């Protein structure tokens, strides 16, 4: 093209860039400020170029700067103050201090036309010319899409030089050329020896920053410092990141060819020398660098930018936030780069809209250039692919992008841009368009597959083509879901015109990097996850959506939660926009009528006489805040507030705070005066604050202090005023009284009212708070903290709507009569009208009625209206409260002290209501409030706490309220089970805490539980999502919180002996261990809510184990429900552990204790969990009698001790469990018979299959989704397991695990579980029964093996969802130590382990099954799945499902012995005691094995089947395998096997794997049921080996054999190796992943740790299925002390890969998360090609293990 271009440009002018300086005077305008946003600064250099200039990142339309300033202008001076090399905050302050007018001097890059002087250089290289042209037009052109988006305009990244860089390369060349078009100089450096360096250091512009003395470049003499590098080895450097350029140079293989442009004016050399040349850190942090589309740098960069950028986290958004507000919100994830690119596309001439436009922009360019430009445009999309975050705390689903990807992008970029092959395809749509799509708004929409013989295929569309336009609809910035829906909506027979461009390389990188969509949303409703991989959330949470077509299906989005400091915290599934709108609408309408009879009773009980109208009006008003104008998902971007944001203060002393600020800081704060709504109206009745009033105050450069309702705050946010909302969190009612007496003695406001209303406010509107300050009544330190918080919030970036508000908000803010809203109640601190006598009286008189909660009743309606009706409605101590746990937790983050307390309290509270008298409840409610307040508003603390509490102790209790969509059921739960509710509340209150437990401890525990719950919730969230099952699942979740406990169990157990019987101690330990997670508690509450929701029926479930026993049994709420749920929940809770193997492990013990206390509960729980049928049983009498049959011995034994242990936690009570377990174990054989009955139920397991089937659906998905699909499968399998576990399998396991026998049986049952999800469910049930059989011996044994396996598995499970697994792991180790404890501890551990194992097995089985056999038997499973759901064990099990051990709750409950895991397969017989004995060999401890053996054969066989599921067979091995198993979910080869058709993987992989995978699954526990059974039936010993996993050593070999059986040539994996690693000396295994791969390759990844191994196609010889695993370890002996509070982290984790001795035909890529400080920006160009450090990950190529 250079020749062509030269010809075309022979008479044309070359476009080059120069810098112009302009000085403008801006006048501050109300509502706009100066109308600009700035980014950059010394502390926030451009992520790519390192430029530290202050850059105009956004110019508001209609603002004062419009037409005067432009985006990407560099700010040179403000009011005469130089802005060179200053910090961002300094620049912002200068603008703020400038008053009404600001004189701003800017430097602007201007393109000028200069006679083209390329011809000479052009001959040098056509590419060269092209690249030059490209660069010339690139500024706006297609590559501009990249460049534009990413750096060219530096839209968001303007602040960085990277933009400049991208522009610079062209612009600099041009600038040089502008004066005199200098010819590009071609330089070729040839190394004389391999280790010789080129001696170049490239800066952000891709220009020569410096030349080393005596280097090749210096000796050559043709390169000078400041030369702009146009091409590297034929690849155009325009829009290329430094990382990509570095990669290109590293790949030069000793010969480096470069085309450079002499920069006579040394413009580039004068660019501020930041860390711009540090491609590694900067590249990662500066998206611009990744412009070239280096996925590695781009992804990492963005991810780093996003969270890490400055404390204000300005950087992530700053780049992108201002300009691509609306368009880039999706791209925002890419941080500025996406936005900048997108905006550039949009704002730049047709950058996004049409590649051709770019051509127009650069007329001089040749047509080919135009194509290139188009390519560039598309390419920009490519850079967008943000690989996964590999950050330590983020369990990202996305695969870490390998640094090497960067080079690919370059080539792709080069090819696409230089030789874009655009095609216009026209055809008529048939039944379908015949296309599968990959990509997304972040990278572009690509064709991932074309249906053979379809019109599209005939017209030449092929995989890897980027779709630029369809029927004149621009596809360059559209999310994948919208693209798919658009194509689906096209009428049949309509002509379809597609403009596409061939970009195979880019597509391949996208698929391999698993990138596509990327935009930010803020939620405006509450959601409880429906699957293990789901994410629960409250209102006001921010997510980055990375895949809008998760699993290749409509309905779910893959999103990453954005936590504190805008860091990405965890990823999972959320409903898509359409579903979210439906859920939100239901949530907003339900509250008004939600509650049912019971809720109505509570709501209206206190509405007597004069209060009725008042309360009704208040209810009406409270509905308003809920009726937000925001959509369910609001697209947001991070931006700076260009004005002084209004300040709203909530809390018991808000009135004092406002007056104090306005009085002492009149130059900064001014109270916005309210006006009567209408002239002549009683001012007190209602008033409004005019928006005009606020604007006037802002125009005076002051913060407007607003006394408004939460509804008004929501409207302010909608109007994009984004007030700073500070919540002053009271410490106690007495504290409020003390403070008000001190601060405003004349005030007549009721301290109690203020306190309660504060808690309600926090519970229902916590999402509105921008910061929370914990009040200490002993001092006035809150005032300084308040001022500091306001200043900090003002300086921070704000998540703002991408677009303008749909309609202008009303011109005023309703102050809302105090009566109308507790927030604005005149009597409350929130209302400016404190004179309303009615309110004052209301404050006073409610004391008598409902106690402290009468008010809450009033607020109930408010809450309901707000969208959390259950919570508010259930504020009474005696009535179940819905906890806005997540919300509260968010607040908890704000107030750490509270969150620990709050959660535990919630737990206590749940129990306490049922247990304590109303008065006591009230008192307790008050006392717990402080605890609650952290979690939730004190007023709603009962509910909120309940949720939290329910998580740890009775998380099930609150479940009902939690689910927003289950309001109807919730009310029933809440209302009908009043006893339950009461129990919940009681528990929430302090009293539920065991006498031994200390509240603090409990609280801590709780938070942790919640957190764990969240994780578990993710894992466990029922995949099925049936309402009925959901509650059961929820209970699982409730138990889940214990997962964390389990993880920490060892340590906890060690400490817990004293609290063994105290839940509080349990929580306390948790708290300590997991405090760091508290910040995630926001989410946890959500989980808790889910629990509540699930536990809807089980409010009594207050599982304050002992205390709750009676409550659980309380039939008054729902005798059946209560017992079922409560008990079931207990057991169910363990089920969730199955997902979080550790959690479950601990939880099981706890549940065991609890359950044992409530003997019926265990049996019931099993049933309930499995299905409604069970519930009837529970409700009947079996509740106590039937469950007892199975669990009675067990529970009774427990009951004696359990009450204490119960509260403490089952894990602690392992001894108790052990005792209980013994009896169940004995009946194991008997139980088997029961299993047979349940065997009929096995069908329920098929639902799991259904989910698995879904995985195949993923198959059609593009390669892009491969990783996602992999995750999906993993999550699906987890979900299925969860469903099975939660509803059936999981729950039964919990039951099993709970009973001591279960733990004993655990090993065997666990394998069974692993066999298949269906089987697992069955086995799970048997587990509980088993416990009956075996006495302490088994318990000890279980404990013995449990600790290792459990912790391993636990870690794995947890790791899936959360980094928390890391912390959990230590706990898990502790449990290992703990198991050495008396039989009790052992038992509890073993039991948990069992459940854990089961849970593990399930997840793993599912994971493996799904990953390996999912496809294989997915279809088979698909058919059976639906029916199985109804069965007790809703959890589907693969083949086993038919023979799966469905342990009927009845049977389990009624016939303690009868509970037998009966696999219809030979496994069924296996369960017989003799088999168990034979298994004893398999199991480490024969004793333990014996009772379990019965269960074990069944379970072990299934477990055995899946390689990853081996864990389920044996706890010990399980841990190791478990880790792998979870990884298989996360990392099994399945993604590729599945239905991925990415170029990277073989599409056929799935089918072949379908065939082999089942075997593998059997080998790996994938096809635990059928395959495993086939194997085990033929070779029971193998299953035994699987079970042997329990006995780490023996089992491992067998397991190994099992794996090997399917792949004779494959290198066997030594189970012992895997297992030992877990407890390796000096190493703590944080996570494991394992999977079976064939010649098609695949990706093995660990979501929680971000570690992944990418096996290319052909790396494994044909015909061999090789199991591969890796363990992510923490080397405690080597690690230096890290100060995590200061952000010190390991740059990369320690990873051990296996099996050792395995050699690959092609190198496999090991990607490790890499968190490199932004300050370490320098990277040496020369380096090992097999080792590449990216922004977020390190990529290592290895050819053998």
Curated annotation (Swiss-Prot):
Annotated localization: Cell membrane; Cell junction, Tight junction; Cell junction, Gap junction; Cytoplasm, Myofibril, Sarcomere, I band
Domain PDZ: 23-110, 186-264, 421-502
Nucleus listed as a keyword: no
Gene: Tjp1
Bias (Low complexity): 893-906, 1388-1399, 1431-1445
Domain of life from the UniProt record: Eukaryota
Composition bias type Basic and acidic residues, residue spans: 149-175, 299-308, 879-892, 998-1014, 1106-1124, 1268-1285, 1335-1346, 1401-1418, 1535-1544
One of the record's GO cellular component terms: cell surface
Protein name per the record: Tight junction protein 1
Organism name: Mus musculus
